[in-house]
């Protein structure tokens, strides 16, 4: 029984962490057993058994755990039962709610259609040769000119050796005679050093100038592509981001942008120039030495290229495995560090290290395969080139014996082939790295092709709104996250301008969904939503979201200063305006007491601040935004009573003469609302003022109010435990069974 209680508590804590960390996978220690000697239930079995609905607890599990349930563990087990709903969702996402969790894709382009390589290259060339940047096109043209000069100088080098050797032979009568040492040394030094030195220096000069000129083109392309991807990701709808893990997405973008620079250089300065040089060398050999030399050269190069391409394609799968392992390792590290406190709570440092090491081991295995196959590729390339070079040299020696070629021709042929071997060796590397870079870039360009589900209509007009006209109206709105599971069923209500309206209801009634629909994170399947008398689907998203401020339940801050996070509400605001909203939110004095004042770093996700301080920052920056409409999505539900009262006092000053909608769980926070709307099963069940709704003792609101009030009283009443003892076991069992069944009606991760 103790084991059951321990795991129940762990599940409940894990469920809470899963709710908050919607962009990361939850780390939960496997369940060893339910209790005693009964059947053992593993996490994957829980997911497999829930066939009817992914979030349901199997009836067999309910029965077994109920039979082994002790009286003292009822509350803990109830929390655990709710948390059990999470397990199947980790395997497969069935809920797309605003803060729902689920199986996030470690592959950022999972479920997306790949972009063809030719389209990637075409898109790349559009950045290399931009129509709106003549200065960059001029740089590309100049770079190509320097490239041609460098290749020409490379071809000249073997000819320098040929003419030097031939002239020396002529001076000594067909045989190289070193009897006259001064003349010989002078002639060789002059011919080789001047010709070779000038050619090599010229080639190096052209290459370096080319790199310097083209550098701005490459960096500009990288910057523009990275910016476009980043902006596009922000424009995608919430559903896309809820199905992707942040760590994997970040790594994919990083690898893709790094691959851009390499592919740009490879396409413009390696692959095409190598092809040009191969044709040039083959033509020279055909003209100077005969068709046999050209055929052997082309045959060697063709075999070399075919072997390189075939082996590289085979090796590509190992790079894909490395990327996947790299993504998994990155996700594990980021998720574990973001959940630092949770790891400490359960003493799971070693478990996290072992889990992380498992991904690293997978990466190591794939990397070793890649390294060993690379050695095989390099040896094969060297063998093919050596065979071709040997054949060419044999043909050249036969030509010298026959008198059709000179010793200088032998030197020239050898020099041309060795000159060609440098880019050929690099060709293998370029092809391998280009293939790998294209794999990395595929995700980047695939993301750019993803179309958002929430977008402006053609020629959408900006929202015309003022605080005096900021009415909010829902007209027969129907909405469901998953087909067949309705969240809102024909809901209709209106919030007059400048009024405070509260929306309350039980879990799963659709309260938070209203916020997401009004902010257009989602579109209703039926019905319309109006703001200032205008259908929000007919106005631009930018103007709509500028007019609506949101104070979320879990305020997440940027890893920056307090001042930066406050200023984020309106980045053009003056320091005086920032200080004013901080005072209005009751935060100014607390900030001044900090060692660095407004320059205090808040830490990752604002974890250096208390919950109350984070909520006040969220309220302050919403005020700084100065929207006509403010939405409070259970903004104080996670705070203690004292902090809640302080923040509610600050809110009263904020909402004066401003349209405000409060999504509330604690009814005590909305007693002063102009109107309270009670939702039940996705419909407006009741509406009225606090006192008006309490006047009906059988109303849903009245029952909720008295239930919450009795909980507070019972919490402080020392006789409550004695009263519990008088409740019969049978009544307790029936009550708990009913609560368990009710707890699994929703998805368990959100308010649906």
UniProtKB/Swiss-Prot annotation:
Sequence intervals crossing the membrane: 141-161, 186-206, 260-280, 291-311, 383-403, 410-430
GO CC, alphabetical: mitochondrial inner membrane; mitochondrion
Effect of residue 433 to Q: Loss of ATPase activity stimulation by [2Fe-2S]-(GS)4 cluster stimulation. Loss of the ability to couple MgATP binding with stimulation of ATPase activity at the nucleotide binding domain. Loss of [2Fe-2S]-(GS)4 cluster transport
Topology, Mitochondrial matrix side: 23-140, 207-259, 312-382, 431-752
Sites where the protein binds glutathione: 315-319, 378-381, 428
Signal peptide: none
Membrane topology value: Multi-pass membrane protein
Domain annotation ABC transporter: ranges: 472-706
Residue numbers of Phosphoserine PTMs: 336
Modified residues (Phosphotyrosine): 340
Modification N6-acetyllysine, positions: 216, 251
Transit peptide boundaries: 1-22
Keywords assigned by UniProt, alphabetized: Acetylation, ATP-binding, Disease variant, Membrane, Mitochondrion, Mitochondrion inner membrane, Nucleotide-binding, Phosphoprotein, Transit peptide, Transmembrane, Transmembrane helix, Transport
Activity regulation details: ATPase activity is stimulated by glutathione.
Role this protein plays: Exports glutathione-coordinated iron-sulfur clusters such as [2Fe-2S]-(GS)4 cluster from the mitochondria to the cytosol in an ATP-dependent manner allowing the assembly of the cytosolic iron-sulfur (Fe/S) cluster-containing proteins and participates in iron homeostasis. Moreover, through a functional complex formed of ABCB7, FECH and ABCB10, also plays a role in the cellular iron homeostasis, mitochondrial function and heme biosynthesis. In cardiomyocytes, regulates cellular iron homeostasis and cellular reactive oxygen species (ROS) levels through its interaction with COX4I1.
Disease (UniProt): Spinocerebellar ataxia, X-linked 6, with or without sideroblastic anemia: An X-linked recessive disorder characterized by an infantile to early childhood onset of non-progressive cerebellar ataxia and mild anemia, with hypochromia and microcytosis.
UniProt name for this protein: Iron-sulfur clusters transporter ABCB7, mitochondrial
Gene source species: Homo sapiens
């Amino acid at each position: 029984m103790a084991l059951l209680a321990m795991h129940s508590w762990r599940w409940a804590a894990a469920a809470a962490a899963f709710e908050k960390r919607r962009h990361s996978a939850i780390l939960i220690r496997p369940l060893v057993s339910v209790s005693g000697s009964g059947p053992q239930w593993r996490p994957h079995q829980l997911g497999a058994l829930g066939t009817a609905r992914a979030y349901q607890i199997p009836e067999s599990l309910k029965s077994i755990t109920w039979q082994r349930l002790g009286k003292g563990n009822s509350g803990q087990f109830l929390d655990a039962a709710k948390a059990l709903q999470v397990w199947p969702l980790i395997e497969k996402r069935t809920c797309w709610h605003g803060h729902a969790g689920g199986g996030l894709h470690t592959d950022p382009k999972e479920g997306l259609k790949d972009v063809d390589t030719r389209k990637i290259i075409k898109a790349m060339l559009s950045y290399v040769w931009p129509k709106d940047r003549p200065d960059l096109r001029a740089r590309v043209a100049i770079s190509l000119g320097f490239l041609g000069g460098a290749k020409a100088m490379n071809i000249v080098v073997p000819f320098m050796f040929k003419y030097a050797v031939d002239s020396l032979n002529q001076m000594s009568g067909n045989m190289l005679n070193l009897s006259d040492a001064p003349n010989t040394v002078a002639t060789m030094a002059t011919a080789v050093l001047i010709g070779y030195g000038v050619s090599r220096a010229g080639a190096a000069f052209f290459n370096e100038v080319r790199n310097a000129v083209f550098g701005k083109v490459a960096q500009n392309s990288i910057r523009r592509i990275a910016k476009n991807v980043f902006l596009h990701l922000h424009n995608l709808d919430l559903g896309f981001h809820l199905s992707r893990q942040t760590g994997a997405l970040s790594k994919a973008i990083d690898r893709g942008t790094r691959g851009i620079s390499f592919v740009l250089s490879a396409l413009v300065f390696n692959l095409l120039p190598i092809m040009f040089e191969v044709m040039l060398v083959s033509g020279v050999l055909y003209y100077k030495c005969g068709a046999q030399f050209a055929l052997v050269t082309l045959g060697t190069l063709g075999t070399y290229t075919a072997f390189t391409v075939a082996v590289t394609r085979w090796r590509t799968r190992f790079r894909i495995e490395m990327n996947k392992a790299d993504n998994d390792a990155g996700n594990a590290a980021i998720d574990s560090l973001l959940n630092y406190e949770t790891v400490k709570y359960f003493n799971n440092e070693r478990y996290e290290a072992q889990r992380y090491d498992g991904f690293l081991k997978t990466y190591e295995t794939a990397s070793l395969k890649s390294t060993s196959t690379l050695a095989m590729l390099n040896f094969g390339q060297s063998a093919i080139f050596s065979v071709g070079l040997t054949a060419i040299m044999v043909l050249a020696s036969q030509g010298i014996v026959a008198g059709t070629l000179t010793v200088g021709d032998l030197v020239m042929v050898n020099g041309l082939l060795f000159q060609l071997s440098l880019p050929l060796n690099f060709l293998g590397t370029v092809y391998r790295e280009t293939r790998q870079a294209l794999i990395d870039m595929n995700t980047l360009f695939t993301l750019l092709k993803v179309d958002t589900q929430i977008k402006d209509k053609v020629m959408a007009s900006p929202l015309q709104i003022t605080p005096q006209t900021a009415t909010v109206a829902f007209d027969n709105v129907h909405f469901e996250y998953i087909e067949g599971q309705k969240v809102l069923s024909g809901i209709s209500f209106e919030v007059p301008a400048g009024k405070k309206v509260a929306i309350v209801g039980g879990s799963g009634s659709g309260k938070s969904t209203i916020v997401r629909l009004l902010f257009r994170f989602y579109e209703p399947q039926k019905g319309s939503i109006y703001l200032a008398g205008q259908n929000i689907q007919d106005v631009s998203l930018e103007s709509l979201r500028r007019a609506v401020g949101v104070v979320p339940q879990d305020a997440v801050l940027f890893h920056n200063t307090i001042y930066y996070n406050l200023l984020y509400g309106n980045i053009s605001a003056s320091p005086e305006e920032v200080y004013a909203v901080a005072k209005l939110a009751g935060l100014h004095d607390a900030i001044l007491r900090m060692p660095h004042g407004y320059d205090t770093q808040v830490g990752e996700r604002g974890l250096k601040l208390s919950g109350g301080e984070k909520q006040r920052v969220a309220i302050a920056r919403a005020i700084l935004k100065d929207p006509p409409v403010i939405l409070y999505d259970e903004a104080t539900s996670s705070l203690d009573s004292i902090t809640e009262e302080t923040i509610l006092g600050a809110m009263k000053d904020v909402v004066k003469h401003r349209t405000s909608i409060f999504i509330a769980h604690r009814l005590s926070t909305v007693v002063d609302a102009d109107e309270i709307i009670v939702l039940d099963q996705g419909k407006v069940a009741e509406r009225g003022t606090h006192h008006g709704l309490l006047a009906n003792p059988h109303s849903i609101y009245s029952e909720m109010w008295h239930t919450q009030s009795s909980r507070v009283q019972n919490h402080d009443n020392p006789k409550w435990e004695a009263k519990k003892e008088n409740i019969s076991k049978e009544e307790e069992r029936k009550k708990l069974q009913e609560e368990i069944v009710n707890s699994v009606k929703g998805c368990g991760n959100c308010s649906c």
